[in-house]
């Protein structure tokens, strides 16, 4: 190039045309019919000075509603949590700043160790034997868990609670469409928890797995011990989609006999933003280790006895055994997994426990305030979400709340007509008493 920073100067163009034997750009495109050529300049504005452009873009961006400008009570799978400042500082290091595991992985011992630590932290939270290096998001992890269950048990039916996130169920049904022999049976709710009688009746010897969410989509905590008792003698797998932050306080699924625990680590160090990215986790037992999708990092020793890390059990993966792979997914969210690892490490076991307790306390306070205001709050032991019934459409209420710089809860009417005019409200450790009181007060005024 004739200029170090500006490509395609007139001199560059002439040199390229001369090299290929064309006299002009018009001659270069001479084979294109003239009636479809645009014989004028594009109708776009001239370039702007950087300062002018930044001012204009900032004006446009200021129209956005964000958790920095508004108080958010929106959850439904994506939550407004505290992320330690060290997270962004660490993941911005050039050694880490990529979403991919390297294709010559053993060269990058630091990155492999970081992934190994993520796997270890997930195992500790879930009380499981092994975890993979991450997946795209929790819903992908859930669908892959169901596919593993079909493969392991050689059965064709999976029983799932309607208390699972509705989009997780949509992903599962998308997977099932490509496997016509698979049957997905959805179990109704009893209030905001799974109807255990219907669940027990649906589980039979043809059931590959039973899947529930913990806490479930409606914020209620399912009875994992009782659910597991229904499937013990059916040789079906027990899949639990769990909020990892809640596991800092709740008894982990592994202690209830779960075979696979999946979820999304977004509550740890990953900002709430429309469309992601997220970070799915996938944890299971040693028995199912060789069927786990995605990458696994293992600890080993080199010839000199030094600790080292490797990608292990790679024969499971589609880049090794494409026709017999346990999954078509090898990519992962290594950068977000690192962010979650840093957040968990910075908080520590006690810190995660403390934040989980704050979520429960703040949510319960908000519940009581709504009840005092005369709202119907649906029954259920909850973590940081609960359901409130309104007299008016939720969309209308939320549109009005925005005027008071409040982002309201999720409109459950989108999911089911049974929950028309019901709002799913998330109250995390970041919400203050004043913010909760203001939200309840304005919601009461708008509901009159």
Curated annotation (Swiss-Prot):
Read off the CDD domains from this record: GDC-P
Protein's GO biological process: glycine decarboxylation via glycine cleavage system; nucleoside metabolic process
Report if keyword Oxidoreductase is assigned. yes
Q: Which reaction does it catalyse?
A: N(6)-[(R)-lipoyl]-L-lysyl-[glycine-cleavage complex H protein] + glycine + H(+) = N(6)-[(R)-S(8)-aminomethyldihydrolipoyl]-L-lysyl-[glycine-cleavage complex H protein] + CO2
Alphabetical keyword list? Oxidoreductase
Q: What is its EC number?
A: 1.4.4.2
Superkingdom, according to UniProt?
A: Bacteria
One GO term in the molecular function aspect is: glycine dehydrogenase (decarboxylating) activity
NCBIfam families, sorted: PRK00451.1
* Record's subunit section: The glycine cleavage system is composed of four proteins: P, T, L and H. In this organism, the P 'protein' is a heterodimer of two subunits.
Q: What role does it play?
A: The glycine cleavage system catalyzes the degradation of glycine. The P protein binds the alpha-amino group of glycine through its pyridoxal phosphate cofactor; CO(2) is released and the remaining methylamine moiety is then transferred to the lipoamide cofactor of the H protein.
Family assignment?
Answer: Belongs to the GcvP family. N-terminal subunit subfamily.
Protein name per the record:
Probable glycine dehydrogenase (decarboxylating) subunit 1
Q: Which organism is it from?
A: Staphylococcus aureus (strain NCTC 8325 / PS 47)
């Amino acid at each position: 190039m004739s200029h170090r920073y500006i490509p395609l100067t007139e001199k560059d163009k002439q040199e390229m045309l001369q090299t290929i034997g064309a006299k002009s750009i018009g001659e270069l495109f001479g084979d294109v019919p003239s009636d479809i050529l645009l014989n004028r300049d594009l109708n776009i504005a001239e370039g702007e000075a950087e300062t002018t452009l930044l001012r204009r873009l900032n004006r446009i961006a200021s129209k956005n509603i964000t958790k920095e400008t508004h108080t958010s009570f929106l959850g439904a799978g994506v939550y407004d949590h505290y992320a330690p400042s060290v997270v962004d500082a660490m993941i911005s290091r050039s050694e880490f700043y990529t979403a991919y595991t390297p294709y010559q992985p053993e060269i990058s011992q630091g990155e492999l160790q970081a992934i190994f630590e993520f796997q270890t932290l997930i195992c500790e939270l879930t009380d499981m034997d092994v975890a993979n290096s991450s997946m795209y998001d929790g819903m992908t992890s859930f669908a892959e868990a169901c596919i593993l269950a079909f493969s392991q048990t050689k059965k064709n039916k999976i029983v799932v609670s309607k208390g699972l996130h509705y989009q997780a169920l949509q992903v599962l049904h998308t997977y099932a469409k490509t496997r016509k022999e698979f049957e997905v049976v959805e179990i109704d709710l009893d209030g905001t928890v799974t109807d255990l009688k219907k669940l027990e009746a649906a589980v039979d010897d043809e059931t590959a797995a039973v899947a529930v969410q913990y806490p479930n989509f409606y914020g209620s905590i399912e009875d994992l011990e009782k659910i597991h008792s229904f499937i013990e003698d059916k040789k079906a797998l027990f899949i639990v989609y769990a909020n990892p932050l809640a596991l800092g306080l709740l008894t982990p699924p592994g202690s209830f006999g779960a075979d696979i625990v999946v979820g999304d680590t977004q509550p740890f160090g990953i900002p709430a933003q429309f469309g992601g990215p997220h970070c799915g986790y996938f944890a299971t037992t040693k028995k199912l280790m060789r069927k786990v999708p995605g990458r696994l990092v293992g600890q080993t020793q080199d010839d000199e006895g030094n600790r080292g890390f490797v990608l292990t059990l790679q024969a499971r993966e589609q880049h090794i055994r494409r026709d017999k792979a346990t999954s078509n997914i090898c990519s992962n969210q290594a950068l977000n997994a690192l962010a979650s690892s840093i957040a968990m490490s910075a908080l520590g076991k006690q810190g995660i426990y403390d934040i989980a307790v704050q979520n429960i306390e703040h949510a319960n306070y908000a519940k009581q305030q709504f009840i005092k205001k005369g709202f119907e709050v649906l029954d259920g032991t909850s973590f940081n979400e609960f359901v409130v019934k309104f007299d008016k459409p939720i969309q209308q209420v939320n549109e009005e709340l925005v005027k008071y710089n409040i982002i309201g809860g999720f409109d459950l009417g989108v999911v089911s007509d049974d929950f028309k005019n019901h709002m799913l409200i998330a109250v995390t450790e970041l919400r203050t008493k004043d913010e909760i009181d203001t939200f309840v007060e304005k919601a009461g005024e708008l509901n009159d």
